[in-house]
Curated annotation (Swiss-Prot):
Its main location: membrane. InterPro entries: AAA+_ATPase, ABC_transporter-like_ATP-bd, ABC_transporter-like_CS, ACT-like_dom_sf, MetN_ABC, MetN_ABC_transporter-like, NIL_domain, P-loop_NTPase. The complex is composed of two ATP-binding proteins (MetN), two transmembrane proteins (MetI) and a solute-binding protein (MetQ). It is found in: Cell membrane. Belongs to the ABC transporter superfamily. Methionine importer (TC 3.A.1.24) family. The lineage of its organism: Bacteria, Bacillati, Bacillota, Bacilli, Lactobacillales. This is Methionine import ATP-binding protein MetN. One of its GO terms (cellular component) is plasma membrane. GO terms for molecular function: ABC-type D-methionine transporter activity; ATP binding; ATP hydrolysis activity. Part of the ABC transporter complex MetNIQ involved in methionine import. Responsible for energy coupling to the transport system. ATP binds at G43, Y44, S45, G46, A47, G48, K49, S50. It comes from Levilactobacillus brevis (strain ATCC 367 / BCRC 12310 / CIP 105137 / JCM 1170 / LMG 11437 / NCIMB 947 / NCTC 947).
Amino acid sequence: MTNEAIIQLKDIDVTFHNKGQTVTAVKNVSLTVNRGDIYGVVGYSGAGKSTLVRVINRLQQPTAGTVEVNGQDILGLPSKELRVARTKIGMIFQHFNLMASRTIADNVGYPLKGGTLTREERQKKVAHLLELVGLTEKATDYPAQLSGGQKQRVAIARALANDPEILISDEATSALDPKTTSSILELLKRLNQELGLTVVLITHEMEAVKEICNKVAVMDAGEIIERGDLVTIFSQPHEKLTQDFINTATQINQALTKIYKQAQTLGLDDHQQLVQLQYVGASTDAPLITELYKRFEVVSNILYGNVEILQDTPLGNLIVVMTGAPDKLAAAWQYCQSAGITVTHLQPTDPEVA
């Protein structure tokens, strides 16, 4: 990862006209992706994320705005130069689009046809690409003989045939089971590290973003509503939609649902509070529960606990029932906040979370 911008989208609008109606799919979006990033763009269906990334290689012509890739004005390129520029931007999709009548090796080598490589050089390159994605032994097989995950690996190898600097993954894991999804994401991360490949990951699953991305942008109704580095977004989200995505990815939603269903059995009184504690980095190593009791005689009953490792940074979540005198509870809150811990008072009757 560097601070050198490889993709710069500025003030992008994409508007469609159909039967007298105007639909704005992307509205005034600016986005910078640096070389070596794995940049996640997350949003629900219809948020505009796929339309936005298709602007990068001009598969979608924007209504307004500018697009620079590797310092080139993509929107100003004539057809011939645009075709050359597109060879440096690979794409993979939810559907693999493999040719059923061709072998795996032929599918991977197809983008090389008509190029400058000799037949022997093409064969050598295809063998290398298949080795990269772990499918050397499948070279002579046909797509029908492969699993979904293997087919996506073939699609990745094919997308790398022209040595792209950028790989756009547009919902490429959406049709795969969780285990296969994880293996594909690990492959993308390895390619990013070994080849210096810049990856733009389009997804509706924050879990995928959490696995491999270093930066993330959240889209809603054609706009980017929040963006930043992964740890900051997960530890300090500002928008409710972002928090919803994070809660789903960290399993907090499931924990809260169970806790709220049992809220009546908790029997909270004036000396008790249901609290979520979120802490990042070195704070995760501190013996927090012990300190709260030693300093303030506040007893914390842990209902849920989880620690995620994001970009080598620990991010912890606890849901606890704090018990103590009201003034001691207030002092315990202040202590947590001064230690860099985010404290949220949870209301079991809150319909937003229940």
